């Protein structure tokens, strides 16, 4: 399955929810879903009855798009979550939250997960003192993510860090802004994930 390269705002309208795919734009009145809250397309404003399967599918697609994950990898994450102790749906969200690119985004080094993924791939960070370029790497408690010295003058990163107060940092992470460093204080819990996600619908979809 190819990665989506079309307009990001169209995806938010399709899912009927803010996915925060466009960085700072998503926090302004320019956000597409704030201006047009109905789905895109000729029949977007029409009322369409959606089946239970359709509701489950849309929820899965929404979460995939929030984190920028392709279907095969997302299915793999679900299978891993299903083998773990605890609640499968919550385990899935924890796996997604612990991705290195998501942690870089959550700490404020980037205004979107896609931007954070690019920063990781281009080698802008170290993890526990070692250069890292794998966006899907899973962090653990005690890990330290730091921006490399030569990357600290990148304007986009500095501007993103300035806006981190508005976006907020989850309690399981800690940012030392002046040191361009973030620490994983603990593993995320369900309360840390404030996006409107109904993970049980995804469990029901994959359990069919």
Curated annotation (Swiss-Prot):
GO terms for biological process, alphabetical: ribosomal small subunit biogenesis; translation
Protein name: Small ribosomal subunit protein uS4
Family: Belongs to the universal ribosomal protein uS4 family.
Protein's UniProt keywords contain RNA-binding: yes
Matching InterPro entries: Ribosomal_uS4, Ribosomal_uS4_bac-type, Ribosomal_uS4_N, S4_RNA-bd, S4_RNA-bd_sf
Domain of life, per lineage: Bacteria
Oligomeric and partner information: Part of the 30S ribosomal subunit. Contacts protein S5. The interaction surface between S4 and S5 is involved in control of translational fidelity.
Gene this protein is translated from: rpsD
Organism: Citrifermentans bemidjiense (strain ATCC BAA-1014 / DSM 16622 / JCM 12645 / Bem)
GO molecular function: rRNA binding; structural constituent of ribosome
Pfam families, per the entry: Ribosomal_S4 (PF00163), S4 (PF01479)
Function of the protein: One of the primary rRNA binding proteins, it binds directly to 16S rRNA where it nucleates assembly of the body of the 30S subunit. With S5 and S12 plays an important role in translational accuracy.
Biological classification of the source: Bacteria, Pseudomonadati, Thermodesulfobacteriota, Desulfuromonadia, Geobacterales
